[in-house]
């Protein structure tokens, strides 16, 4: 499987800071047992970035963070 790059993810979420926040939150969800939206055998952080690059997860992750 090809490596995931930040540039792949920036096509979906252009702001690097929002990208980091969304990926972090999604990786935490995956590590707590949520089902991945893509098929992946990688660690939660890589799976989260792959989901973002594929357009399966986006900035809506930031709206789910309790405030």
UniProtKB/Swiss-Prot annotation:
Which EC class does it fall in?
transferase
* GO (cellular component) term, any one: DNA-directed RNA polymerase complex
Q: Would the keyword Transcription turn up in this protein's UniProt record? A: yes
The family database entries (InterPro entries) matched by this protein are listed as: DNA-dir_RNA_pol_omega, Pol_omega/Rpo6/RPB6, RPB6/omega-like_sf
Q: Which reaction is this enzyme known to catalyze?
A: RNA(n) + a ribonucleoside 5'-triphosphate = RNA(n+1) + diphosphate
**GO MF terms, alphabetically ordered:** DNA binding; DNA-directed RNA polymerase activity
Q: Which SUPFAM superfamilies match?
A: RPB6/omega subunit-like
Q: Keywords assigned by UniProt?
A: DNA-directed RNA polymerase, Nucleotidyltransferase, Transcription, Transferase
User: Which EC numbers characterise this protein's activity in its record?
Assistant: 2.7.7.6
User: What GO biological process term is on the record, naming one?
Assistant: DNA-templated transcription
Q: Which residues form a coiled coil?
A: none
Described by its record, this protein's role is as follows: Promotes RNA polymerase assembly. Latches the N- and C-terminal regions of the beta' subunit thereby facilitating its interaction with the beta and alpha subunits.
Please name the PANTHER family in this protein's record.
DNA-DIRECTED RNA POLYMERASE SUBUNIT OMEGA
Please give the HAMAP family that the UniProt record associates with this protein.
RNApol_bact_RpoZ
NCBIfam families (UniProt xref): rpoZ
Record family assignment: Belongs to the RNA polymerase subunit omega family.
Record protein name field: DNA-directed RNA polymerase subunit omega
The organism that produces this protein has a lineage beginning with:
Bacteria, Pseudomonadati, Pseudomonadota, Betaproteobacteria, Burkholderiales
């Amino acid at each position: 499987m090809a490596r995931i790059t930040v540039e792949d993810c920036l096509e979906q979420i252009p702001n690097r800071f929002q990208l980091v926040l969304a990926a972090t939150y999604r990786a935490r969800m995956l590590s707590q047992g949520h089902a991945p939206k893509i098929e992946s055998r990688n660690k939660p952080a890589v799976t989260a970035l792959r989901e973002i690059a594929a357009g399966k997860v986006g900035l809506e992750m930031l709206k789910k963070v309790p405030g």
